[in-house]
Structure formats: C-alpha cells, structure tokens
Amino acid sequence: MDEETPSICEQCLTDADLRMTRAARGAECKICTLPFTLYHFKPPGAPRVTKTLVCRRCAAQRNVCQCCMLDLAWKLPVALRDELVSLVQGSDERTPEASNEMVRRFLALRGGQLGGARLTADSAPLRELMGKMRAVAAAAAPAARAHGGREDAGEVPETQLPFGGALATPASRSFFIYGVDPALPEWELVDAVSQLVRTPDWRDAGSVSVVVRQDARCAGIRFRREELAQAFVARLETLPAAAGAPKGVLRIRHLRMHVVAWPEFHLAAFGETKQQTEGIARLATKTMRADAEGASPARPAAPASAAGKVAKKAAAPRRQGRRGPRPTLEL
C-alpha cells in the first residue's frame, strides 16, 4: 500500500501539480512505528517543507491526512471526530490506540477501519450520519431560542477560560495552554507532552483529552492520572506572576506557550463562532504580552561544579606594556 499515491488533503497539498520527493522506507510511522515510504514537498509560499508523518495503512484505517492527521471528511482531529460520532450514534466509536508497540503494529497490519472512520470514510454511512446530526441540530434549535441564546455572537467566553489561573492547583488533571502558534499541529503538542512525562500513554481514554484550536491560539490537555499531571507540572519552566500565582512555560522548538491548571476543562469554552475564536486569540496574545512584561521564566538551576567552585577560568595575567630600552653591550 505504501507504493500507492499518498493520502494528503487539499489544505496540505495546495496544488495538484506540486513536485514531491519520495524516499522508500524513509521514516518510521508516528502510529505503528513501522518504516514507510516518506513523501515531502514545499507548497508555494510555505516557510518550510511538509512531509508525511504516518504510513498509508494507518492513515486509511483512521481516514486521516498523512501530513496534518485530520479527518479527510470533516477536517477535525481524530479524538474530536470520534467523540462527535459517538454522541450521534449513541455508542462508543473511539479509535483504539494501544500503548504497546507490538499491539500498535498488530492493529496496523490487521487492516480495516477504526473508530469513527468506519462512518466518515464511506459516502453512504457519512450521508446517514450527517442526516442524524442535522436532526439533532434541528431538535436543539427551539430549545436554544427559548433560552435566548447569546445576544452578541462575538462575545468572548472569558469567564470560562483560566487566563488568570495558576499552574499548581491541587488534584487537577487538566491544563489550559495559550499562546499556541497557528502552525503548531496537534501531534507535535502530543509528542512534546509525551517527552515531558516520559510516556506516550498519558491521555484520558474516557474523554477528549487533547484539543488544539490554532484559530483561538489555545489548547487543552487532560491526563488520565494525577501522577502524570504532577510530573508534567514538575518538568515545566515556571513564570512568576505579580499576584503570586506562577504559570508554566511549555517550549516546542522555538515556540513558547504558557500553561495553567484548568479543572473545568470543556470544549465549549473555546468558542462557537469565528468572532469568538478571534476574540479569544486576541485575549491570548494580550495575556502573553502581559505575562512577559511581568516576569521572565525561571529555568532549573545548572549543576554546580566540583567542590562548589565557580566554573570560570582564571583571568589571564595582563601583558606588560612595551619593553624598555635594551641594555647596551660593552666591548
């Protein structure tokens, strides 16, 4: 299957006549870890090269793009898509993701489709699913009108987002991340958190555990155990705040984001309209600027040198000035 045309969405490809470079067994799949045929290319005007991250087999199983790993039908992250499908179908449609490498390879080699991809990858089940979603939306519309709804579609739900929160909150397994770069993909955030807590099996399988909203410059993560959340907090840099509530600093490549605890983690807080997400993005940028003006991040102290000595070279003695006159030789 790797020898076939790669499965890449229009947003990543941008041009059907784009020139690609193909490397057989050029990388390991981010999901099954098996070697696969790597494709990389540079879209017109893009600042960097785009490459495939997962193999064709794993992408087909989940009905996702090999580059951005978003659902090909809905352009949503897999976890969010499966959650929506589960709500509409009334059954558990989550994609099984094994933590064991051998099980991941077994799932990849078994073939078939997983989770919500069983419905979104085929046109007939997708039409039926969309019909159910329209029926649910039509039934919910009168109730929304009865409650008055939002008078201002551009209102930003600031009270639902903990921009003024702190990093260390007892018994919190969820965190709010703001200052997210619009070009940061979800998989890269997941990888960065996995490296910090030193395990890829940190997500809560019982709910949506990772949400990245690049348009709102925010994200949310939820750990499955409190011990993992504490390990995450312990390995972050800290940013002291003026009010005495320190925040965390998460660095991915050259990007820097701020982290606070968010016990009330929920999807609706990220906004429902374009005006709301734009307002949240402005608020995130403003808060990042205010945080930077208030304090600079404190990094872990560097290890002391042996015997507590200062690791500085002794200053070399200054050279003397010009030499005096040479002594006269008497013959």
From Swiss-Prot:
GO cellular component, as recorded: Prp19 complex; U2-type catalytic step 1 spliceosome; U2-type catalytic step 2 spliceosome
Stretches with biased composition (Low complexity): 293-309
The keyword Nucleus is annotated on this UniProt entry: yes
Descriptive protein name: Pre-mRNA-splicing factor SLT11
Pfam families, sorted: STL11_N
Function: Involved in pre-mRNA splicing. Facilitates the cooperative formation of U2/U6 helix II in association with stem II in the spliceosome. Binds to RNA.
Similarity comment text for this entry: Belongs to the SLT11 family.
GO molecular function: pre-mRNA binding; U6 snRNA binding
Organism: Eremothecium gossypii (strain ATCC 10895 / CBS 109.51 / FGSC 9923 / NRRL Y-1056)
InterPro entries, per database record: Cwc2/Slt11, Slt11_RRM, STL11/RBM22-like_N
Key words, A-Z: mRNA processing, mRNA splicing, Nucleus, RNA-binding, Spliceosome
Protein localization: Nucleus
